[in-house]
Structure formats: C-alpha cells, structure tokens
C-alpha cells in the first residue's frame, strides 16, 4: 500500500494536449507601450534607474537589484520612459514600475556585448548582470541559486514540461539546443559541479534524440527520458526520479546534492554568454478555449496577453 501511495505521489496520468508541440514560435506584434515591474522575481524589488523622459534601448538596465536575493531588470523595447510610478500587483502589494512608450525601432543598447568570463567570480557576476531568474515559474534569481552553501554534485535540467498544454520548452529544445549545451557547460565549468542530467518526459522523442546527439561525446552530460506523468516537473519529484534521492522536509534541492534549472533558463543563459543580451523576451504557449489558433509565440517582456490576435475577448476574464 505504501509503495502504491509513493508511486501516486510521483505523478498523475492525465491526457496530454500538446497540439502546439510542432508550432514554431511566431513573433508577437511590438506593443505601443510596456509597463515593466521592478518586482517580478523572488526577493527584494529592483530599484528603478531611469526617470520620465529618459531614452532607453533593448537591453538597457532600468532596474538595479535591490539586495542579494534580487534581480536586475532590463528594457525589452527601445523608446522613451513615459512614467516611473507605483503599480498594484496581483497580490495587492504595490511596487515601482517603468512605463515605456516604444518607438518601433527595437534599437539595441550599445552597451550590450558578450560578458568576459574567466573564472567563477566573473561568471556569477555575469549571471547577476543578466537578470536571469527561474523561467519555469518560480522566478528565483539564478546567480543566488548557483551559490549554494551545501555540496552539490549534479546540475539537473528540468526539461520535463509535464503541464498538459505547454510546449514552449519543447520548441526551446528543438530550436536552441546549442544555447542549452553552452549554458550547461558554463555552469559545470565555473561552479565545479561534476555532472549534469537533462530530464525529459518520453513524450518528446525528437527533443531526446536531438540532445542525445548533441551530448554523445560529453560524458559529463546525461539525457534521461522520464515517464510522461503530470507532476514530473515539480523539482522534488524530478530529483527523486533522476537521482533516487529525497529532499528533506522543508529542505532545498541542494540538500539532496542538486541544483535544478529549467531548460529555458539555461538556454537563456547560453544566449546571454554568447551575445550579452539579457532577459528581454521569451517564447510562451498561448492555448485554451479562448484561443482560436493555439500556438507558440515570441513576446517581448510585458507584451499584454490581449494583444494576441487569435484570442476571443468575449471568452476571457476581464482581468486578463
């Protein structure tokens, strides 16, 4: 009976609705205006560095991390700062926000260039400058995650994408495998973690095959197919399935010798190390009953959901 309960706790069999798995990301129209929040991560809010009337570019740092557990914020558009003002978050709290009127040019900031990384200190500084946080949903600052007090022997890449509808991570693996590998190798090299396991649910055979080919000559990286059950992507379950270890109650993955990164997070890191472009856009899946044409889209940060042309406004909640 206990074994049955344990198996049930490690995932639930749910119907897969991955209709967008083959949908290559389509660029979303550039919004006329964006509101970029200074609190979009776990930890202290960033401190706004710009004022009304300032000109900004794609990649301009507009928010400075407000503490050790915090993150830098960068402009996703080029244009002019229309306002720096308080904004109420969904949890009822207030935070500063930067409103930018876009100029439609998407001019890249001249300061954007690949970081010079030579050792662990410069690597962690680059990750912090990038403003990278967990893109799987938690939003924890990546540079902090990569500095655990515990001894860690495994970098675990969460590529399971077990959520029933989402396929953006699938497209990230298919389209950006070189960035993923670059990010992984950098983490291993500069943190001293000896090995990496990429956990992918077995309903993504193309992703498994591609990443196996990309890593076949690297003994430090293993691609591990996982059962396609809902819940596999929860990091505590992922650790047990990939490493056979349990995280202590109230503990962190590092207490089980692992650091867990989402596959899009490590891909974004790989892109940043090659180009110097911080987190200013991402691929997301738009799907569901209110969407006439489910698809993956590439959107600059803080593009409004209602800008998606195939959404049925009448079937969306008023707050969306």
Give a label for each model feature.
Residues 155-169, 290:
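Gly-rich Lys/Arg/Thr-decorated short loops/hinges at beta-loop-alpha junctions or inter-strand turns
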Residues 194-300:
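Hydrophobic alpha-helical positions that pack around
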Residues 79-81:
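Conserved hydrophobic positions within beta-strands
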Residues 1-45, 49:
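N-terminal, Lys/Arg-enriched amphipathic/low-complexity engagement segments
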Residues 51-64, 83:
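Short, well-structured beta-strand-loop connectors
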Residues 303-310:
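Conserved small/polar residues in nucleotide/adenosyl-binding loops
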Residues 122, 171-218, 305:
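Internal alpha/beta scaffold segment
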């Amino acid at each position: 009976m206990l074994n049955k309960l344990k198996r049930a706790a490690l995932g639930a069999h749910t119907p897969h609705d991955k209709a967008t798995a083959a949908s290559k990301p389509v660029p979303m129209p550039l919004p006329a205006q964006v509101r970029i929040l200074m609190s979009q991560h776990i930890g202290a809010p960033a401190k706004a560095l710009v004022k009304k009337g300032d000109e900004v570019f794609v990649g301009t740092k507009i928010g400075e991390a407000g503490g050790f557990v915090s993150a830098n914020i960068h402009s996703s558009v080029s244009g002019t700062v229309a306002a720096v003002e308080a904004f109420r978050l969904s949890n009822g709290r207030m935070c500063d926000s930067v409103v930018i009127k876009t100029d439609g040019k998407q001019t890249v900031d001249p300061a954007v260039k690949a970081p010079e990384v030579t050792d662990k200190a410069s690597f962690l500084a680059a990750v912090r400058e990038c403003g990278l946080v967990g893109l799987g949903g938690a939003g924890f600052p990546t540079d902090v995650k990569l500095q655990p007090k515990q001894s860690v022997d495994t970098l675990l890449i969460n590529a399971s994408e077990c959520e029933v509808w989402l396929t953006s991570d699938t497209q990230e693996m298919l389209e950006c495998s070189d960035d993923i590998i670059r990010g992984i190798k950098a983490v291993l090299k500069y943190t001293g973690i000896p090995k990496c396991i990429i956990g992918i649910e077995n309903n993504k055979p193309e992703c498994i095959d591609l990443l196996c080919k990309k890593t076949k000559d690297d003994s430090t990286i293993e691609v591990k197919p996982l059962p396609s059950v809902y819940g596999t992507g929860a990091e505590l379950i992922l650790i047990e399935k990939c490493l056979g270890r349990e995280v202590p109650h109230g503990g962190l993955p590092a207490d089980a010798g692992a650091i867990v990164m989402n596959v899009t997070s490590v891909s974004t890191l790989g892109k940043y190390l090659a180009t110097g472009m911080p987190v200013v856009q991402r691929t997301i899946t738009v799907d569901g009953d209110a969407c006439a044409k489910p698809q993956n889209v590439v959107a600059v940060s803080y593009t409004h959901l209602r800008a998606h042309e195939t959404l049925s406004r009448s079937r969306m909640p008023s707050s969306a």
